[in-house]
Amino acid sequence: MKAVILAGGLGTRLSEETIVKPKPMVEIGGKPILWHIMKMYSVHGIKDFIICCGYKGYVIKEYFANYFLHMSDVTFHMAENRMEVHHKRVEPWNVTLVDTGDSSMTGGRLKRVAEYVKDDEAFLFTYGDGVADLDIKATIDFHKAHGKKATLTATFPPGRFGALDIQAGQVRSFQEKPKGDGAMINGGFFVLNPSVIDLIDNDATTWEQEPLMTLAQQGELMAFEHPGFWQPMDTLRDKVYLEGLWEKGKAPWKTWE
């Protein structure tokens, strides 16, 4: 099964970083968050990726074109015009990079890659700026079992601030970012049948609006509930939080070795 990843947005709330790179190339632990997302899928056997490029898409192309350089130690023999790669690291991935336009909306980007998934029974779809400890295989099995056109992952949004456990005026413990108000939201990890792309009109279509609402009205949208870790990287605060988890060795989304 293929995974389509949106990677063309501006990331204006991370402008400190995105002035020189697209948002999915902002790094967590020295690796682009796009890489983390692909590793999340890869550990569940997903090897074929379609990346919807847009704003500064050349940065993503350069990264994959020189992937082994980014991931390996290298010696440059300058006088001999020769390069030696040490402990070459590779991934078992097939990565298709598609220019989906600088200003296309989320639905428009998906429509532009329709030819790459049209013959598949179903495909995975997500955004290039969020991580989770989601059981990808379970979402696929859920989608196949219910027989509807679309599955979204429903999750609890993280709280913005840590919480205090106070008993009789005494602080007993701290909780890092407890869950939000109890209502589940669209977590942005989808399993879709190719026919859903017919609901997208053009580049100006936002996937989260008319297409998803139409699927819901038709009774063709199911929710896979994920109560575990989920965190988007919308702001610098989010990036710092994710970076901290990674550096402490407590990144829940890291389910690979």
From Swiss-Prot:
* Cofactor dependence: Mg(2+)
Which reactions is this enzyme annotated as catalysing?
alpha-D-glucose 1-phosphate + CTP + H(+) = CDP-D-glucose + diphosphate
Other comments on record: Catalysis proceeds via a sequential rather than a ping-pong bi-bi reaction mechanism.
Q: Which Pfam families match?
A: NTP_transferase
* PANTHER family, sorted: GLUCOSE-1-PHOSPHATE CYTIDYLYLTRANSFERASE, GLUCOSE-1-PHOSPHATE CYTIDYLYLTRANSFERASE-RELATED
The gene is: rfbF
**What is written in the cofactor note of this entry?**
Binds 1 Mg(2+) ion per subunit.
* Residue sites binding substrate per the record: 6-13, 23, 104, 109, 128
Keyword Nucleotidyltransferase attributed: yes
Show the GO MF annotations: glucose-1-phosphate cytidylyltransferase activity; metal ion binding; nucleotide binding
Q: What is its EC number?
A: 2.7.7.33
Residues holding Mg(2+) = 129, 234
Family under the similarity heading = Belongs to the glucose-1-phosphate cytidylyltransferase family.
InterPro entries assigned? G1P_cyt_trans, G1P_cyt_trans-like, NTP_transferase_dom, Nucleotide-diphossugar_trans
Q: What GO biological process terms does the UniProt entry carry, in alphabetical order?
A: O antigen biosynthetic process
Stated name of the protein: Glucose-1-phosphate cytidylyltransferase
Fetch the NCBIfam families from UniProt.
G1P_cyt_trans (TIGR02623)
Which UniProt keyword terms apply here? Lipopolysaccharide biosynthesis, Magnesium, Metal-binding, Nucleotide-binding, Nucleotidyltransferase, Transferase
Q: Where are the transmembrane segments?
A: none
